[in-house]
Amino acid sequence: MTAQLPGILSRRSLVKGVIAALSGLGSGPFVTGQEAKVPGRATEAEEIAKVEKLLRAARLGPLHNTRSAHFLAVGDAPESHQRQALAVCEALGEAFLVHFRGRGFTVEYPDLRLTVIALRDQDSYAALLADAPGKDVGGHYDLETNRLVIFDFRSQQAAIVAQAERVNLFTLVHETAHQLSFNTGILNRQVDLPVCVSEGLATYVELWRPGVKNAIGGVNRPRIEALRQAVDWIRIGDLLVDDTAFEPKTEQLAYAESWLLVHYLLRASSRQPRFRQYLAEVQGSNKPADRTRIAEKTLGPLAKLDHELKDEARKYLRG
């Protein structure tokens, strides 16, 4: 899963990296020690060993690892960069939990720290992928392994150093939002989930900024700009049922409508129970054929929801 901010910044300028973000956050509460063994799950030491084996196979090194209260960083990025990245993750995680608890969700961190593979630069990222990353790729959250992969963008794009803080923060926040969504009780990696739901949550969070009150859930102007630039509309019923809208031709609009959907459902307290019920029902299904039934049951008639979202879009486009 990768972030794309339409209109104002291309995915190339948004990209990679992350670790340089926000020295003003400080190093945060970093700790050492191992987690207790959880049946069926790797211990922290085992996780470090697995990641280091993967990185050494890509001929990366020297390797370091850094811990914060809820995150574990492993990679060839310097420890100072790892600490800065984890400080961002911790600050976002705290705001994330507060925000979603305030909207009726039961959310908690998992027992074990979340893994962040923190790489030195784009070359290290390419080595890990065993392929040159596309110009639109800027780190990613790996749904299968449940790991966030980031790298330091500054060394590759000296020409935009002045933008580095914004670029790095956006990328890190979007991808960490995915990791938090799938690990705090909102989403489940093991079920069939429409892409628009996971991307809608990530875009709902992606403009978070440290030290800004109520920074999660604000109006996402770049996504609105993508709606403005679009010449078409993807019916919400189609977006919830068919993930092909996230192919390159229509992905900008798909991201924008995903943000609009989640923002609309969470903005008003009267709609929040519908969204919580929808997510709870989705947790119990792993069949794509169930998508329409679950959405209609919990969110109401999809044609009506589509009409409401078009009205919502028009309101923002007039603003």
Language model region names:
Residues G28-L54:
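C-terminal segment of N-terminal export signals and the immediately downstream linker at the start
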Residues M1-S10, A20-S23:
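N-terminal secretory signal peptides
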Residues L60-R189, P194, S285-K297:
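Juxtacatalytic substrate-recognition/specificity segment
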Residues A20, L25-P29, N183, W208, ...:
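Short hydrophobic alpha-helical membrane-anchoring segments
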Residues H140-L148, V167, N188-G319:
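Acidic/His/Gly-enriched intrinsically disordered linker/tail segments
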